[in-house]
From Swiss-Prot:
Mn(2+) 2 binds at residues 269, 274, 292, 353. It comes from Methylococcus capsulatus (strain ATCC 33009 / NCIMB 11132 / Bath). The keyword Glycosyltransferase does not apply. This is Probable cytosol aminopeptidase. The active site is at residues 281, 355. Mn(2+) 1 binds at residues 274, 351, 353. Its cofactor is Mn(2+).
Length: 497
């Protein structure tokens, strides 16, 4: 998709489709009102005839409009003007782009960003439009044969209508950021949607290495199992023992800041398939465990977005990648392993493996002397039980960091909800035979998982994002979502400001 600004009068505007807004009770937004006057009240008459009230998400596609320069006009309901909030605006955009995609238009011009959405600026409104349009256009066809290929949408260009060139700067910022975030989300979705027999730890490492060749400021390296053994990463290596696929620790280092500025470290769980190990998962929906690497995919996608934007800060991405399968050499319940930090771990459940690969990555992160560390993982089904599939779970040891992530989530609508990690919960992780157990019983499962990780994050500011409920959709719309790329990138944009 191509995005740009367009400064033109309605009389001279030429496009396959012009997208304009209408508020509830058929009150036209400014561009729609001007267009209606140009068409002698046609739009108002059609809204009334078709009983379109202008509720958020209403749409009316008008073909064969007068003048011959504009082929179609898409009227989009925005709801009550005084109640237009983020949720309503996003609903309206999604509805508009669904109709636009199916309209056959190759080129469209949008004026929806002219409406006020709280205190949001033009750059934010443009970003939302691009992210939602790219999400709506996304199609994962890589694993289908040629005979199964359907007809792709014809839409190839979207322009944002401006009253004056003086309005261009924030819109162009929104385009630049929106495209970078959308590209990062697409990369994360593509990696997540690949099957486990294709997207192995080695494949994930190869994709990261390719990314490193695309951007001058990005250096990518991969630690092999022999390197991990030298470092004492016994927890990470133990998870890989049940698989024929060797583990990898992918290191992405983006240097956008001058001098020796400390980096922000993002860690993403990269379990390319999780059968549960000896503590085998139920067969139903086990295919979705290919998504257990979406934390790693999200970190790789976020790093790509940062590199594309050229943000003036340093960012390190760490992706511990492995499979978790049952085998004669796999972890057994009751086994004890020694982590890189020297902490011994009793493995009471081999299906609580994500925290085992993350804890060694957290210890490894210390060598970068980070400003802050954020780990991202599809860690616990308990988080879905607690929060559903709308927000990601947020836990951490630094209030300011957690507040910054919360604000970034509100900005992007990639929201989080903070949960406690009080010392009280640490009691559940006691082991009679090791320093810590890898599970804490059925109560507060997402919290005790974070409490486990917190033991390896005492030397820096740290936050944990449990994306088990947000990284992919199940059911008829099954597929990776690309979250939390928008959240992570917004957090870094805010730090670079």
């Amino acid at each position: 998709m191509e995005y740009s600004t367009r400064t033109d009068t309605l009389e001279r505007l030429s496009t396959d489709c012009l997208i304009v807004g209408v508020f509830q009770k058929r009150k036209l937004a400014p561009t729609a009102e001007a267009l209606d006057a140009l068409f002698d009240g046609l739009l108002a008459r059609l809204l009334k005839r078709d009983d379109v009230e202008g509720k958020a998400g209403d749409t009316l596609l008008v073909n064969h409009v007068p003048g011959g320069r504009i082929d179609r006009v898409l009227l989009v309901g925005l709801g009550k003007r005084e109640e237009l909030n983020v949720a309503a605006y996003r609903k309206s955009l999604a509805a508009a782009f669904k109709v636009l995609k199916e309209s056959g238009a190759k080129h469209a011009v949008s004026a929806l960003h002219e409406v006020e959405v709280g205190q949001r600026g033009a750059d934010w409104k443009i970003r939302q439009a691009i992210e939602l349009l790219e999400s709506g256009l996304y199609r994962f066809q890589e694993m289908k044969g040629a005979s199964a290929e359907d007809h792709p949408p014809r839409l190839s260009r979207l322009q944002f209508l401006l009253a004056s060139d003086q309005d261009a700067a924030p819109v162009e910022t929104g385009i630049r950021e929106g495209q970078a975030i959308a590209h990062g989300m697409t990369l994360a979705r593509n990696l997540g949607n690949l099957p486990g027999n294709v997207c192995t730890p080695a494949y994930l490492a190869e994709q990261a290495l390719k990314l490193g060749k695309e951007y001058k400021k990005l250096k990518v390296s991969v630690l092999e199992e022999s390197d991990m053994e030298e470092l004492g990463m016994g927890a990470l290596l133990s998870v890989a023992r049940g698989s024929r696929q060797p583990a990898k620790l992918i290191v992405l280092e983006y240097r956008g800041a001058a001098g020796k500025a400390k980096p922000y470290v993002l860690i993403g769980k990269g379990l390319t398939f999780d059968a549960g190990g000896i503590s085998l998962k139920p067969a139903a929906n086990m295919d979705e465990m290919k998504y257990d690497m979406c934390g790693g995919a999200g970190v790789i996608g976020a790093i790509q977005a940062v590199a594309e934007m050229g943000l003036p800060l340093n960012v390190v991405g760490l992706v511990p990648a492995s499979e978790n399968l049952p085998d004669g050499n796999a972890n057994k319940p009751g086994d004890i392993v020694r982590s890189m930090a020297g902490i011994t771990i009793e493995i009471l459940n081999t299906d609580a493996e994500g925290r085992l690969i993350l804890c060694d990555a957290l210890t490894y992160a210390k060598r970068f002397d980070p400003v802050a560390v954020i780990d991202v993982a599809t860690l616990t089904g308990a988080c879905i039980v607690a929060l559903g599939r709308h927000p990601s779970g947020l836990m951490g040891n630094d209030d300011a960091l957690c507040e910054q992530l919360t604000r970034a989530g509100e900005t992007t609508w990639d929201r989080v909800w903070r949960m406690p990690i009080w010392d009280d919960y640490q009691e559940q992780l006691k082991s009679n035979f090791a320093d810590v157990a890898n599970i804490g019983g059925p109560d507060g499962g997402s919290i005790t998982a974070a409490c486990f990780l917190s033991r390896f994050a005492k030397d820096f500011k740290w936050a944990h994002l449990d994306i088990a409920g947000t990284a992919w959709k199940t059911g008829a719309d099954k597929g990776a979502t690309g979250r939390p790329v928008p959240l992570l990138v917004q957090y870094l944009i805010d730090r670079a400001a």
